């Protein structure tokens, strides 16, 4: 199908800018220049109407019947207009085919390229086992629920674990830490008491042995 093309029409500067005045031009010359510009505008409009009439008479439904890919200023891929994208009345006669993942963006490409590395780093059976493993409690039940991977990171001696869940408030945490410190102090007191008793018993035994030895040496 042949395309109807309009001849290039050159519009002088005075038409695009009516207030333009060349150097040394009188008022009469300016009015003559504007009259000539009006003639050029009329000729251009007549040529455009002739092109539109020719396109209608030859049955051209879409003057953009060639494939054109528009790209944005930042280099992103644009859209494609193909044959019969628009009907004779200017409305869309059909939807273009969906763009490929490369056109949409790099998200799908990046995810697909990293999938083997993710599978190699974290095996699927490990993920399923971690998800199916029940939650465990550490300490004596006062600590919040911990998963299998979190139990080894919990420091029961320092007692400075903050729960990541929303079921433990600040007051609950303070009470839990206070109970742990009280138990630690109580165990320390018991240990010191036992150590003192043992030390007294050992000293008594040593003194008895020394007394018996001295009694035998010095009758």
UniProtKB/Swiss-Prot annotation:
Renumbered residue ranges of the record's region Acidic: 153-168
Subcellular location: Virion membrane; Host Golgi apparatus membrane; Host smooth endoplasmic reticulum membrane; Host cell membrane
Keyword Lipid metabolism: no
Chain span(s) of sequence motif Di-leucine internalization motif: 145-146
GO process annotations (BP): intracellular transport of virus
GO CC field: host cell; host cell Golgi membrane; host cell plasma membrane; host cell smooth endoplasmic reticulum membrane; membrane; viral envelope; virion membrane
Transmembrane spans: 194-214
Chain positions with Phosphoserine modification: 163, 165
Virion surface side: 215-219
Membrane topology: Single-pass type II membrane protein
Intravirion side: 1-193
Modified how: Phosphorylated on serines within the acidic cluster. Phosphorylation determines whether endocytosed viral US9 traffics to the trans-Golgi network or recycles to the cell membrane.
Superkingdom of this protein's organism: Viruses
Keywords: Host cell membrane, Host endoplasmic reticulum, Host Golgi apparatus, Host membrane, Membrane, Phosphoprotein, Signal-anchor, Transmembrane, Transmembrane helix, Viral envelope protein, Virion
Function, in words: Essential for the anterograde spread of the infection throughout the host nervous system. Together with the gE/gI heterodimer, US9 is involved in the sorting and transport of viral structural components toward axon tips.
Family: Belongs to the alphaherpesvirinae envelope protein US9 family.
Protein name: Envelope protein US9 homolog
UniProt lineage: Viruses, Duplodnaviria, Heunggongvirae, Peploviricota, Herviviricetes
């Amino acid at each position: 199908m042949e395309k109807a093309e309009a001849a290039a029409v050159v519009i002088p500067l005075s038409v695009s800018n009516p207030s333009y005045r060349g150097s040394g031009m009188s008022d009469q010359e300016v009015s003559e220049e504007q009259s000539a510009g009006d003639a050029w505008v009329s000729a251009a409009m007549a040529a455009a109407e002739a092109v539109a009439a020719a396109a209608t008479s030859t049955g051209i439904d879409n003057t953009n019947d060639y494939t054109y890919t528009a790209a944005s200023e930042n280099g992103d891929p644009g859209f494609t207009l193909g044959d019969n994208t628009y009907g004779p009345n200017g409305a869309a006669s059909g939807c273009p085919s969906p763009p490929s993942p490369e056109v949409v963006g790099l998200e799908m490409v990046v995810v697909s390229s990293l999938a083997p590395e993710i599978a190699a780093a974290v095996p699927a059976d490990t993920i399923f086992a971690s998800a199916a493993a029940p939650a465990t409690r550490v300490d004596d039940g006062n600590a919040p629920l911990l998963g299998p991977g979190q139990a080894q990171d919990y420091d029961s001696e320092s007692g400075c674990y903050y729960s990541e869940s929303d079921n433990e408030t600040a007051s609950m945490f303070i009470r839990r830490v206070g109970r742990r410190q009280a138990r630690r102090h109580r165990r320390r007191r018991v240990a010191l008491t036992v150590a003192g008793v043992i030390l007294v018993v050992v000293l008594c035994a040593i003194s008895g042995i020394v007394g018996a030895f001295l009694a035998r040496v010095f009758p």
